[in-house]
From Swiss-Prot:
It is a multi-pass membrane protein. This is Protein SNA2. Residues 1-6, 54-79 are cytoplasmic. Pfam families: Pmp3 (PF01679).
Length: 79
């Protein structure tokens, strides 16, 4: 798990709907379900928040990184 996900787990321990909101967004089914579970009790909301965080891990955008070729004819080129 990424450090951002661990931070969300820490937030979920205190306020589960806030962690789900930060992870999935405001107008989502996950937030509505978590809020309803949180109204039923703290532990159902916590378990659902941990489930949402683990099912949707943080992924860095690797499209902004490009790999350089190993051939010598491209030495010094940027593309």
């Amino acid at each position: 798990m990424h450090a951002r996900d661990w931070f969300l787990v820490f937030i979920a321990i205190f306020i589960p709907p806030l962690a789900v909101w930060l992870k999935r967004g405001f107008f989502t089914k996950d937030l509505l379900i978590n809020f309803l579970l949180f109204l039923l009790g703290f532990f159902p909301g916590l378990i659902h928040a941990l489930y949402v965080i683990s099912c949707h891990p943080y992924e860095e955008n690797e499209a902004r990184y490009s790999h350089l070729s190993s051939s010598d004819d491209n030495y010094g080129s940027l593309a």
